Amino acid sequence: IDPPYNLAKDFNGLSFSAISSEKYAIYLRTWFHKVCDKLKPTGSLYMWGDWKCTAALQTVIEERLTVINRITWQREKGRGAKANWKNGMEDIWFAVNNPDDYYFDVESVKVKRRVLAPYKVDGKPKDWEATSDGKYRLTYPSNFWDDISIPFWSMPENTDHPTQKPEKL
């Protein structure tokens, strides 16, 4: 779920004003609990937010679901700030209906990392792949994603949207 961020922005001829964190949480509750009603008992969801709205997201998510993890997605697009740190990340909350029974296919999201030598189990390489491009190991993914680029201005999928996500996500 990628809800509107609590930003003061003009986009496509519409103006949006930032509101207090408390009012933003009230807004989230107007629709989020209905989304949760649609989840299967083993269901899970991912919900995006920036640094300014993520506290409200966590609060509202935890009213109905169990947060399993918070993923930090490093994004390079954004404007610098002369009196502050440029925001180069977003949070992605991973939450489930039932923490004892939910679907997560780790095999489909393993990450290919370059390594010098394989890990071995009973003398045989584990999750090891030697190719003409190098030697790799399939490893479990972390909750820090730095390998998915935001669409830059020269990319066909780029839009003017202030919080655009890449198709790869």
Located regions from the model:
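Core catalytic lobe of class I
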Residues: 1-169
